[in-house]
Amino acid sequence: MNSHENRVAAPLLSFRLSLVLFAVLSVLPLGGCARWDNPVLSVKETSAAQLLGANQINAATRQRILRAVGEDAQERALRDDLKQHPGNVDAAIRLTKALVAQKRPHEALQVLDNVLVVTPDNLRALNAKAVILDIEGRHDAAQELYRQALETNPENQMLHHNLHLSLAFEGKSEQRTLPQSR
């Protein structure tokens, strides 16, 4: 071999060696995921109980798992309670808070609508629904509900406050919305 052939063959050999090394290093990690009796990649689901007790999981991940499992169980319990007692405003409001925290306001509105069918003049349910409508940016509908609730109880400071906030969010300031105290 002359020196010209060595200059061409050395980089070519190095390139081939790199490709082989890359292929081997790519396949080895995948081989660790496959089982011998089944050559495809194996996926094994781990139960929530096993995850909660696992020592390899760091504390932050364990907290997220606990929160997710707890929220799901709490939501199921509240929904079951509402199925048995459709007019349970306390359970509806707790479920509504959980759904809004999970960024599911449409479901929260459905829960409150179902409660309002059973107890149409409940101030807490009307207020909760109006608050969610405000969160969604539907201020006119929210203000209508606040006014409806204020007709039932004109002295309720929470309803007055929430109506003022709704008007402020919308950029309005109406004095006619507030009933005059005598």
Swiss-Prot record:
Subcellular location: Membrane
Highest rank taxon of the organism: Bacteria
Annotated InterPro entries: TPR-like_helical_dom_sf (IPR011990), TPR_rpt (IPR019734), Ycf3/AcsC/BcsC/TPR_MFPF (IPR051685)
Bilayer topology term: Single-pass membrane protein
SUPFAM superfamilies: TPR-like
GO CC annotation: membrane
One Pfam match: TPR_19
Keywords recorded for this protein, A-Z: Membrane, Plasmid, Repeat, TPR repeat, Transmembrane, Transmembrane helix
TPR repeats: 89-122, 123-156
Major site of localization recorded for this protein: membrane
Transmembrane segment boundaries: 17-34
Protein name: Uncharacterized protein y4yS
Organism: Sinorhizobium fredii (strain NBRC 101917 / NGR234)
